[in-house]
A protein has these predicted regions:
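Core nucleotide-handling region used for phosphoryl-transfer chemistry
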Residues: 1-175
Length: 175
């Protein structure tokens, strides 16, 4: 991969940060936040970084299953967060370059919103509840990580132990 849109290869820079700590048969997926040289990676979003700085936020990890098969084990989000926190704890020099993901809520949406009836357009109604839930998700609020005034992008939903390893993004309207 070459530099492409940016003046340098931001993906190689991010890979170089994490590569020494990634085990064989382990794949780490991450979001690169901040700046790629003089350009914001996501226009209008500094994520607390000064121009020219960035950090990597691992959000997904897969490893080879212990049974020796070629099937990958998909880590749950708590495991990804814990791996990242341990990495930074063991290597404090990475604290500004690697950040753990924020988990806004861990549990079922039926438990979070017991008043939303499963039998009455549950999918639509629970998404509406989430969009209006400032306590848990802060949708349509300013992104607290940013120094500049930018609205949150949204949230990602994942199901623990999902055999399909799906992720769903609920984007903020202001994004």
């Amino acid at each position: 991969v070459g530099p492409g849109y940016y003046d340098f290869d931001i993906w190689k820079e991010a890979t170089d940060i994490l590569a020494p700590y990634i085990d064989e048969d382990m794949t780490v997926y991450g979001e690169i936040c901040g700046w790629a040289g003089e350009k914001a990676i996501q226009k209008g979003y500094d994520y607390g970084c000064k121009q020219g700085e960035f950090f990597v936020m691992p959000y997904r990890i897969t490893t080879k299953k212990k049974d020796g098969s070629d099937t990958k084990y998909e880590w749950n989000v708590d495991e990804v967060r814990q791996w990242t926190e341990n990495l930074v704890k063991e290597h404090p020099e990475l604290a500004e370059k690697v950040h753990p993901i924020t988990i806004f809520y861990h549990g079922t949406l039926a438990d979070l919103y017991p008043n939303v009836k499963v039998s009455e357009h549950w999918h639509e109604n629970v998404l509406q509840e989430m969009m209006n839930d400032k306590e848990h998700f802060g949708m349509e609020e300013l992104e607290p990580m940013c120094k500049n005034k930018s609205y949150r992008e949204g949230i990602v939903l994942r199901i623990d132990d999902d055999p399909f390893a799906e992720a769903f993004k609920l984007k903020c309207k202001n994004f």
